Amino acid sequence: MSPYIWYPNPIIPDIAKAVGPERMKRWTPVKEAIDSGTLVVAGSDWNVVPSVNPWIAIETLVTRHVRGGGGEALAESEKITLQQAFDLFTVNAARQMGTRNRTGSIERGRLQI
């Protein structure tokens, strides 16, 4: 799931016009996917984002607010825990790539990339 559209940002009003208010209540249903047992990882094919900083993505997954807080939350029911947010970028990504036996966590003998 793309971390660049799961919190309020300039493109969201245009998306809301296209999909409507009911669908926006479930916008980017990260929590729903995790709760259903889906292996969720962060990623994007959108190369025009101002920053690929994972800490911004982790913060906004947990708060569903713009970076630094404040304003209205986007699909507040889709907030996840800090541990779940870390997992998207670490162990879940390693599982998705089939490298969980050697990456995805900070442990002796693991590759850190």
Q: What is the predicted function of each stretch?
A:
Residues 2-113:
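His/Asp/Glu-enriched, well-ordered alpha-helical/loop segment
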